[in-house]
Structure formats: structure tokens, C-alpha cells
Amino acid sequence: MSEDGAQTAEKMDTHTQYYLESLIIDALKGKGFQKIIELFDGKVIFSSQFHNKLLLSQLDKLINKELDRNEFKHVSVLMKCIQHFCKNDCQESSTLIHQGLVSKMVLWFERTVDFLRISKEATLLTLVEDFYDSALVICKCNCEDGKRQLLDSFLIRLGHLVTEKWVACHLRLEALRTINCILDSISREDKKKLHCSEDLCELTKDLARTIQEAGDYDIQVAISEALCRMMGKKFRDSFVHQWFEDNFLADAFKEIKDKEFETDCRKFLNCLNSRHQSNKGVYTFPCITVFTDLDELKKPQDENMENFWIDFNAGSQCVSFYIHNTEGSLWDSVRLLKESVNNYTLKENDGQQMLGIYLKDPQVINTNDVTKVKIYFEPKHDIKSAIKRVFEDINEIHSNPVELDSTEGLIDIGNSLASHTVITTATTFKQWKRNQANKMDSASDILGSQTSEHSSTTKTSSANRSVQKSLSNADSHEIVIESVPLEAVITIADEQPNTAQFQDDMDDAIFQGAASDVPAKDSSQEIIIITEASADKEFAAKKTQGIFQFQGYSDTLASDQVSDAKKKILLPKQSTERATPASRYRASMNSPLQRTSSAYRSHLFCESNEVTSNTESERSWIQDFKNKSAVKSADYSCEKTRNKSKRKVLPLASESGDDEKQVDTTETVARFTSRKEMHRPEDINPKSPHSAELKLPGISALLTPGDSRSQSKSDYRYQSAIDDQDIMDPVEEASSPEMSIDHNKEPKNGHDEVYASGPLNRSVDGNNIYHAADTLQHATGKRKHKTCEREEIPFKPRKLFSSTEKNVNRSAADSEDSEDVFYSESHDQDLAEASVLSAFDSFTKELKRKFLTRYKRIENRANHVLKSSHQQVSTVLNEIHQCRLQKINHFNKIVVHELSSLEAEVQALKQFEKETLDFWEDQYVKMNTFCSSQTQRIKTMDSALLETISNLKNVIQKTTKEEVSNTEEHIQNKLLK
């Protein structure tokens, strides 16, 4: 390759690795989410994705922006992007976590919960579930800091969500399962510190109170498990009296043993529910037996499980019970929700109460599609009150659902048979049992011959299409009936119905008519075409004869019964899951992140190292994604014990990190041998263009659901080989044989691969043709894992990977693109390489163990120092706070006292001012009076003075005149002398 070509390839590879981040930036700029949605829908395939340090801030802005716009679907897509980054590479996830991903998630989750208070949109419910998935992805990353952050912040928020009564039941249950998964993933040291957290102690009290108010048995079990995980046995005994004020309940909770959690928890919850008669939320009764259609269900096989318990949950409005799983050691759960029930009957016969529940759509129970469940109780139990509390709005049928008016087998389903009639042969269940073998052979031959003719019609039919809808099509001259057995259907113009006496229970008449000639499960299936009646008169005459009239029984129920037989006989096997937008249980064929139903809980302590198959039943909702080890971590579920002597009790909460499973050399050799056998040249088309495509690892595992029950034996072999690998590794996933085979096998009918969000089924004939299941699963439907899925290898940091192991993985990926090189390797070379890999694997794990031991010592020392510093700082801050409070209180008292003194002085001054004004007013009056009198006096004195002066003048003048005269006389006298 030239230098320019190498540079161009390097640029293209860099662009591909950062493609998802570029789409997020484009969405932030307002260019939409369509390309990201197509990426996660599987329409675009790319290699491993990376990001820069600015991604978290960009995601924060974009998520808050979309939440402000109420675009919850876009936020779900962004959460899937976060899951992919965390799942794709441990280094990438550590970068996001160290930047504060968990704290951002808590803020986003709180905003989402606030929206959930005022809206119940399906996209909003899905977003809440995506937060659960993101938390699980972080748990599976090999980042202890992320787990610790989840434990400190996100787990508390989930616990508060569980205690809220307004939250939907399935969201609360999924939140509890997420809490238990988080608690199961943390180390033993972190578990020992849980009882020291005040927030967690308060949360345990709230959860214990919620147990008594939940109204659903599964929620009660999940809360009990969470309490047992949060508090060890010795701390549990000290906290239990704070959780339960009733000493009887507290003592009953103490009796729960970790190794017998399921049965002991059943005893405790039965005791708790029986003591709340006034406000009872869960009614629990032992039943005699349970039947689904014609099959009997068995109680879980446990020597401590004495009765077959049926729970009537008033809070979640469902009937639930656990049954024995015939193909695994786990328990299967059956939940009959109110929304999926059409009606029910309750009657007493032969000293037994029979509760019949009729479903709207078929539900998968023990790998069978079921539309009717019959539960038998002893007459002493008050079943009527319990069922009315659960199905309060559903009418009870007091008469038989099906009444036989004559000996004919004519079925009238409402008004949908206005111009068409279906006649079934009158046969009893015993007759069917005697003739089953002969009829099965003939039916298989006929159906097999018709499969090729009507294959296109079969593919377009859906599992939930009712007979009533098919019969009401007046434009067609042919009726496509997919639910009536082949030998039970005849044309009206050719044959008259036979007469027979039905000896069985009238409640089973519908199922005998619809399934009287049920062929074997693996036999060929096809559609039967019945021609229209040629004469209306003949039809009217025959209609008046023996008719099954559905009195008090809805037309929908009748069509559902026939639809049940339809999927049993004439349709290819459809997916057993019905997904709803609000459902938590969206199944993914390769996803390691699923939380399966609590019914399939593993035992708290795994008592067997046996690898059980989970082909047609759901896996335990507590998933251990680490390698199987001799010592397993605590796992709260009950395991079927076929041989008690082989059971082994292991200690609680053993840390899987210190006890990694040692990979056996022979197992490694077998893996390489099986891989080479599966990669034979004749099985792979080397010219297929799909081999050169880039694939985004982890996306198909998360978002491409599937059902593994219909896989052939060859699929099982190469699937087992793939499951031994770490599916989270991009190199191994890109070179998996399953991916190569799926890309290179072309369907016989030439159809392209169908991308669908719903469950997909692989056809029985081996071709990679997927039929989208139309049947919607209810909100509490179960998540299912693929067949014989092995426990996955935990995520490892890149630094702990052996360089030789990385080179082997890269060479395996390169060999997928160039098949000739891969297939040229000899069997001896594979064995030698397997031995080298095994040796390096042992060396790597020993080195990892030493590193982890040293790291944990350093971490414990650092944690101790940090804890001491934190306590000292907290003490100082507390003292400062108390001092500030004292100063503020003292200052407040002084100010109040001074204000009161000032107010008193102001009042005194006002009084003094008033007195002064009054005094001066009096003085002013007196002064004016005095002045007036003085003025008058002065005037009087003036007049007197003037008079005196005038008198004085007169006197002076007289005197003067006399003196002058005397003087003159004297002078004259002297002169005379």
C-alpha cells in the first residue's frame, strides 16, 4: 500500500472512531437525532467509538436542552450513547466517571422523576428504564470509583423512588432490582461500611415501612433482599427492631437465613401480610393445583416449600405465583395482570373452589401459549374477597362460559359468522387422546405439503390476529382460519356435523373444540382455507341446529381461545415476549445488562457449581457478569435441589475480584477446536460483502432483540463457543463466528434482513429469516437471555490485558477480513497457541491478583486517612457552625433588648414632650395675662406720671416765680439799702 493510501486509511479510521461523538455535536448544533437513532437501530454499522474530554459537558447541555423541550425520546438515545461509551472501553468509561458522570446522571434522573409526577408518557417510562440500564453498565465496568459513586448518590435516589406510592409498580420493582445489582457488584470492604452511612440507615427504615404498604409480593421480596444486602447478619439483628415496631415481625425477619432466603422470606412475608387485616395489600393462599389449558403446573421443587402459594396483589392488581422450571434450576414466575385479563369465574365443585382466569392475549407459561388458567383451592379460603380486590373492575362470569344447546358442533362467534361458518367435529378429550397419534401423522403430512404453497400468507399473519377479524372480511370469498385444527374443520356444503356427548367440564369445551386435534409442537404448520357457504338457506338451516352459544361470555374471549389454538398449530413459533413502551423487560439476545424477573432469582448463596441451561425460561434477575468461581458472591434466589448431599453452602458476599476463575487449558483447547470447526470454508461465503463491514460492538447486543429458543443445534454449538468470550471486547465481537455466519447466510426467499425494535424469531428451517412478533408484552413481561448463555467475563482495564492476548485478539479480527489466512492454520498450531494463551492467562491473572492486593492496601490506607480527615473537618465545621449559631443568638437577644429599651425611652420622651407642651401652654397663657396686666399698669403709671410731672412743673414754676420774686425783692432791698 502506498504512503498516501495509508494516510487516507488512517484518517478514515480516526473519523470512524469519533463518528458517534460527531453526531452528538451535530445534535447539539440543532441538526437532529436521526443519524444517531439509525445508528442504534442497526441501520449503520461502525467500529469502536471514542471521545474527547469535552463530551460530558456537551452531553449535559444537550440532555438538559431536550428535557426542557420534553423530548424524552432523544434523551433516551443519548443515554444509550453513554451506555455504549462505558461498555465499549473501560478506559473511556473511567474518563467519563472521573469527570463526574454519576453526579450528572443523578441530576438528570431527578429532573426525569419530576416530569414523571405529572406525565405517564411511554417515552418517559422508557427513559427511566434507560437510567437503570446506564447504572448497570457502570456497575459492570472495572471502575471501583464508579461503583462507589453509585452507592453514595444514585442508590439513595433509587431507594427514595421505591418508597413513593405514586410511582408505577413495574418501575419500583425495576428500581429495586437495580439497587440489588449495585449492592451485589460492590466489594466486601464497601459492604462493611454501609451500616456507617446515616443516609443508608434512614433508607433502610423507609424501605422496611414500604414492605408493609407495597401491596405486591415481588416488591416485598425485592425489598427484603435489599435489606439483607445492605446490612450483614450481625448488624441486621441490631437494626431490625428499628425497622419493625412489632416484635413478632422483627423476630420473624431475624429468622431469614441467607442460604434459604426464598423459603424463609416466604414465611416472613406470609406472617407480615396476615397481621395486616385492616389494610391488607397482599392475599396469600395455598392452592391444591394449577392448570393452564390442558397442562398442570408444578410448585417449585424445594424441600422447604411445603405449599403451592398463590399471591393476590391488590397494590399491583395482579395474581402471581412461582412454578417449577422443567429446564433449569431457577424458579419461573407467572404474573396475571388485570390489564391482560378478560374475565374470570369462581365456583365450587366437589368440595373445591375453582378460579378460572381468561386472558385477552396468549401468555407464555412454561414455553406454552396459554389463554386460560384454572386454580383450585380448598373451600375454607376466602378467594372471592381477594379476587375482587385485585380484579375490581372485571365482571365475574357466574354461568358456564360455553353452553351446549344441542348435539351439533356448530360454533357461533358473535356476529362475525354472518356469511361464513366453521364446523368442528364433536369429539371429547378422551377420544382425542386415543386418536391423537393417527391424526397427528395425517395432519403433519397435509400441513407439510401446504407449507410451500401458502408460505407467503403464513409470513404475513401475526400471532395476535383474531378469528373474528378474519371472518368479518366480507370482500373475500375465502376465509383464512389460522386457529382451527385441520381435522376439526370441514365445509358446510360437503358434510353435516356429527353428534356427540361432551363428558368433560363445560369450561373446557372451548379448548377441546379449538385444540382437539393439536399436532406435535415441532410438526409442520400451515393455514387452512375454507370456502364460503354456497347457499344462505342451507347455512340458515344448519345454524339453527346444535350451537355453542357464548352466554355471559364475550366475543373477544371466544376469539382469543381460537387464537390460542391458532398459534399452537398453524403459525410458525412467534416470540414469547410482548413488549410495551412502559415495560422494563425489553429482551436483548446478547445484552449482558438485563435485569430479569425476580421469579428467576438465583439463590443468595449459590449451592451448586453446575452450569444450568436457560433456553426457554428467564434467567435470574440478579446477573453475575464475572467468571464462574469456586466461591461465588451472595445471590438471593432459590435453586432447585435434586440431590441435597451435593449442595454446598458458601459464605455470604464473597468477593469475586479476589477469587478469579482459573481457565482450564482443556476448555481453552476445546474452544479453539470448536471455533475452527465452525469456521470451515464451506460454511462461510468468502465473497460476501458483509465481511468487510464495520460493526459497532455492543449495539447489536443491546438493541437487537431475539429469541433463542428456535435455534437449531448447530446454532447452539457455535453460540456456546461465542459465549465463552468477553462479548464486551470490540476485537472479539467483531470477529465472532456468529457475526460472520449471519452476514454470509442468504435467505432463500431473497428478502433483506429486517431491522425491528420488537422481538425477532429465527425460522425453524435454518434460514436467517426473522419474523417480527406483533404480540405486545405487558408492562411486567420478563426479560429473557439467549440459550445456554454463559456467565460473562468481567470488564478489565487495558493495562491488565496481556499484550500477547491483545495480539491474538487483533489477529483473530484480521482473520475475519481475510478468511484464507485464518483457515490455513492447522489444528496443531491452534493447540499450541491455546497452550501459550493459557500460560499467559495464568500469568496475567496472578499479576492482576498481586496488583489488586497491593492496590487494596493502598486504597484502604488512603480511605482511612481520608475518612479521618473528613471526620476532623466535619468536627471543625460543626463547631464553627455551633459557634456562629451562638453568636447570632446572642446578637439577636441584644438587639431585641435594645429595641425594647429604645421603644420604652421613646414612649417616655413622647410623654415628656406632651407634658412640656402643656406646661409651656399654661405659662404662655399666664405670660400673656401678666403682660396684659403690666401693659395696663404701665399705661396707668404713665398717666399718673404725666399728671405728676405737670403738677411738678406747676409747682416748680410757682416756686421759681416766688423765688424770682423774692430774689428780686431781696435784690431790690439790698439795692435800696
Swiss-Prot record:
Ubiquitinated and gradually degraded by the proteasome during oocyte maturation. One of its GO terms (cellular component) is lateral element. Residues 449-462 have a biased composition (Low complexity). It is found in: Nucleus; Chromosome, Centromere; Nucleus, Nucleolus. Residues 463-474 have a biased composition (Polar residues). Residues 674-693 have a biased composition (Basic and acidic residues). It comes from the Eukaryota. Belongs to the SYCP2 family. Oocyte-specific protein that localizes to centromeres at the dictyate stage and regulates the survival of primordial oocytes. This is Synaptonemal complex protein 2-like. It comes from Xenopus laevis (African clawed frog).
